[in-house]
Amino acid sequence: MLARIREVVSIANGSTSSDPESKRQAIEYFEQLKNDVQSTEIFVSLMTDEGSDDLMRFVALQVVCEQIGNGILSQAQLTFVRNAAIELLRSKVNVPNGNLKSTPEYIRTKIAELVTRLFYVLYQDQWQSFFPDLTEILQIQSLLENPNENFSLIGIDYFCRICVFINSEIADQTFVRSKEIQQKNNDLKDQMRVQDVQRLVTIWINTLKSIAPNKQPDIAIMIMACIGSYISWIDVTLIVVPEYVSLIINYLEFPETKISCAQCLCEIISKKMKPVDKLSLLSLLDLTTKVASFDNSVDDVDISEQLARLASAVGTELTIILEQCNEANPPTEESQQLFSAADQQILLQVIPLILKFMLHEYDSVTQQSFQFISQYLAVMKKMFAVGGKAGSVVAVNSKRQSLDSAHEEFLVSLLQVCFKKMKIDESCTEESVDDIEVFCESIRSKLKVFQDTVAVINPQIFLTNISACIQNLINSADWRDIELVIYQLHNLSESIRNNLFGLPKNQIINSEPSMIMNNFMRLLLDNSTVFQMDSSYVQISFFELIVRHYQFLSFSGTKDELSLLNIFCSPFGMFNKREKTRLRTWYLFSRLLKTTKPKFPISVLNEIVGKIAPLLPIKVYSLNNDGVEEDSIFESQLYLFEGLGVLIGGNTDSNFEILNEILTPLFTDLEACISSSQEQPQVVLQCHHILLAIGTLARAVHSGLVPENRVNNALVSKKLIHRSLIEKFMNIAEVVLVTFSYFSKHETIRDASRFTFSRLIPILSDDIVPFANKLILLYLESNLKMMEMSDFLSFLGQMIHMFHKEQSCFELFNNLLGPVISKVHVLMTQIEQERNGEENPEWNGTTLNKGHGSNGKNIIITDAFRDKMLLKKAYMGFLQSFVTNNVTSLLLTTQGREVLPTILNDVLEYTPQEIQELSVMKLSLNVLVNFVKFFGSGKCTDPEDMYAASIEKLDGLNEFFITKVIPLVFEIPFKPEYKFNVREGSCRVIASDLSRLLLELYLQSGGGTSIDTNPCLKYLTEVYLPMVQFPPELIMDLVQNLITSNPKSFEKYFVQLITNFTA
C-alpha cells in the first residue's frame, strides 16, 4: 500500500514520465484515499517516516490536515495523529547541531498547519495543556522564566509559525464565517485569554530580548508578526508597557526587521481604545520622531513605503481622536483639551513627516499618506469650511471657525506638495502611455480631491495658490509644465462649475475665480510657445480644455473666434503628424462648433473650408478577410463634415453656395464609383462612406440653421430654411436615389441611403415626398434582411410623424401601404421557413425556464423566433405611428381596405410563444385597443384625424371585431396551451391590456346598459360565454362590471376574475 501511494504521488506530481491518462487515474485514486478514513494511519506513517522525501512528507501532511479539517476522523484517530505530530515536532527540534535549514520552510509551515488543525479540534476539551506541552516539546520553556540563550531556535521557529496559524484560524476577519464557526472562534479566544495569552506574550518578549536582531532576523520577523496579529484581540496592556514598547521599537534600527517592526507597530497603534488612552499610547511610542530619524537615510523603497504607512497610521489614529472628541455631546473641557493635544501632535509632528513622504520620488510611497490626509481634511471641513454649495452637507455641518495660522500653513504646504506631485515625472516620455495613465488614476486624481477639499475649506487659499502655480508655469518651455498648467486650469474651471467657493449663483459669472479663469485662458491662447510643443499630451489636453470650458473664452468678436479655429486647423491640431492627436482634434472641433454655433460671414467660411478641404476626401484602404476596413479614419472624418455643416448652416449671409465646395468632390467620387465596371468591395464601401458623409453634413447644416430647442419644429424649419438650400438638398436626394438604384443589392448602401434620407427630411419637409416615394419603392424591390426591414419600418414611422398633416404624405402611404405590408409578410414567411428548417432548436436557440407556480414553462427560443419577434415589434411600431399621428383613416380608404384584413389578423392572432414576449405583446395589444377605439364601429372616429370625415363607414367591421376580439380576450388567459399565469408580472400586464380591449369594444359597440342594443354585450351573453360554459351568474356579474366600471376598476375586476378561475 505504501509503495502504491508513493508511486501515485510520483505520477500525479509528474516526477516520473507518464501519459495524461495515467496522471488522471493517479489523481482520482489519490482523491479516493483522502476521503477514506482508513488511509489516515498510512499517511501519518509517510509523514513521520524518515525515508519519505520532502514531496512525500508534504503530501502526507496535506492529506492529514484536510482530513482533520473535514471532520471525518474519530476521537481515537485524532489522538493518534496528535501523538504522531508531537513525535514529529520532537524529531525536528532534536536535529543535530540545531540546523534550522535541515527542513525546508514549506515543510515547517505545513507541520505548523497540522498542529493548528489539532489545536482547533482538541484545545477546548481534550488538549487544554496545548501551549504548555508545546513549549516543552519545542524546548523553549526557559523563555517563560527570563531572556536566555538556552532555548531551541528551531523550536521558537515552529512555535511562531503555529501562533500565526492559530490567529489566522480563529481571528482573521478577511473571510466571512458562519455564525456557528464564529462562535467557536470567539470561545477559543476567550479560553486562550484566560489560560495562555500571558504565556505567549512572555515567550515572544523574552525571545526578542534574547536574540541578536542582525543574526536571527527571521525569528524577530515572526515574533513581530505574532504580536501584530494578536494585538487586536488580547489585552493591550500585556504588550504596551514602556519596556516592551522600547524593545519592539528598537527593531526599527535594523534594515532586516524595519518593515516587520513597522507593520507590528501599525497594528499596535490601531488597537481600539478610549481617546485618552490612545493619545497616551501614541505619546509613549513617539513614533514620528523615530521615523523622522530614518527618513533621509532609507534607500529601500519597500522600507520607505512601510515607514510612510506607519507615519500615516499615527496621523490616522490621532484624527480618529479628533473625530471622537467632535462627537462628544455635549462637549466637555476634557474632550476639548484632548482635541487640542491631538491636533497639535498632528500639526507639529505628523504633518511635516507626511508631507515629506508625499514628495517622495516613488508614487508607491506617496500613496501611503493619502488615507491620513483625507481623514484630516474631513475633520478640517467640519471645523473651518466656508465654501461649498449653499445647502450642501459641508456648508450645513461646518462650524465655520476662524482658520488659525498653523492650519493655514498646513493647507498651503499641502497645496504646494500637490502641485509638485501632479507634474508628470521627468523619466516619462511621450511613449510612457501606461505609466502616465497609472499615475493619473492613482496619484493625480487623489491629489485633485485634496485640492478641491482645500477649496471648500478656504476658497481664498486655494485660489491664491493655484493661481500662483499656473502663473509660474504658463510660460515654461517644458511640455510637462504646460500639461500641468492645462490640467490645473481644468481643475480651476471645475471648481467654479461645481461652486466649491460657495458663491451665490447670480455672482459666479462675475466672481474673482471666473475673472482669473478668463485671464488664464486668454494667456494660454496668446502663448505661442504652447503651439510649438511637440507633445500629444499638451495638444490633446489643450483642445479638451478649450472645448469643455469654452464659456471662459471672452471673445471680443469674429476675429478672436477665427483665431481659435485657425489653431484647430493647424499642425498643432487637425493636421497633426500624430494620428491620435489628429483624430481627437477632429472630434473636438465638431463638438466645439455644435456647442457654440458661431456665426461667420461667407468670406470667413471660404477660408475655413479651404483649410479643412485636404482632410475631406474619403478613401477606402485595405479590407481584411471579413470585408471590414482596416485602420479606417472615416468615422472621425464624419466629425469634420458635422463641424463644417454647423458653420455653413449658421453663416450670417444666408449663402449656401459654399456647400458646393464640399458636395462637388463627393458627387464626383460617387459618379466614379457608379461608373466603375466592377462592384468591388472597396467601391461599395466608398459609396457607403460618401452617403453617410452627405447625411451627416445635411443634419449639421440644419442644426446650425435652426435653434437647438426648435430642431424638430417643422414650422420653424420652414421659416428659416431658404429655397436655395432646399434645392441643393433636393439634388442630394436625387443623387442618393441614383446611387441606391445602382447598388441596391448591397445592404450597406441601402442602410446609408436610409440614413441620409432621414437627415434630409427636416430640411426638405414635404418636398421630400416624391423622392421618398422612389426610395420606398426601391426598398420594397430589394432583398431586405430582418434588421433592415425593422429599420426601414422605423424610417416610415418617422415619415408619418413628420408629414401626417400633409396631403401628399397621406396619398403616398395610401398607395404604398399594401406593398409595405406585403413585404413584411414575405420576410415573416422567410423567417418561418428558417425556423421550420431548424431540425434541433434546442441546440440553435436558448431555453427559457419560466417555471412559476402551477404552470412550469420550458420555452425554446430559437434564433428564427427571436428574429420574427424583432420584426413584429418593428411592424407594430409602424402601425402604432398611424395611431399616435392620427391617420388611422389610412386603413379605411379604398386601398387601405384591401390590406386591412391582413393587418387585423396580425394584431389578433398569437402563438403561445408570442404570449411570453411582453414588449411585443404590450405594443401589439395597444395597437389593437386603439384600432378598436378609433374605427371599431366601422367609422373613423378620431377627432384629430383630418381625413376622417372623407372616409365612408366600413360596414361589418364592428361585427368582425366582436367575433374576433371577445374570443381573444378569454382564450389567452384561460386556454391551457397559452400557459398564462396572471400571478407573473408579464401576464398581469397582458391581462390589464385585455381588460382595456374588452371595455373599448363594448364602448365602440354603442355602450349603454341594454344587452339587446349593444351587439358586444349580446354576443358575450348569448353566444360566446354560454358556448364556453361560463357560469351564468358570472356572465351577469361580468356584464354588470363592464357597464358600470371605469377603466381602472374594470381592470382590477378582470384581473381578479382570471386569478379566481386559474387558482
Swiss-Prot record:
Keyword Hydrolase: no
Keyword Nucleus set for record: yes
GO biological process: tRNA processing; tRNA re-export from nucleus
GO-annotated cellular components: cytoplasm; nuclear matrix; nuclear pore
Pfam families documented for this protein: Exportin-T (PF19282), Xpo1 (PF08389)
Domain of life: Eukaryota
Places the protein is found: Nucleus; Cytoplasm
One Gene Ontology MF term: tRNA binding
Primary location recorded for the protein, binned into one broad class: nucleus
UniProt cross-references to Gene3D superfamilies, sorted A to Z: Leucine-rich Repeat Variant
Keyword entries, A-Z: Cytoplasm, Nucleus, RNA-binding, Transport, tRNA processing, tRNA-binding
InterPro entries: ARM-like, ARM-type_fold, Exportin-1/Importin-b-like, Exportin-T_C, XPOT
Similarity comment: family membership: Belongs to the exportin family.
Purpose: tRNA nucleus export receptor which facilitates tRNA translocation across the nuclear pore complex. Involved in pre-tRNA splicing, probably by affecting the interaction of pre-tRNA with splicing endonuclease.
Protein name: Exportin-T
Lineage: Eukaryota, Fungi, Dikarya, Ascomycota, Saccharomycotina
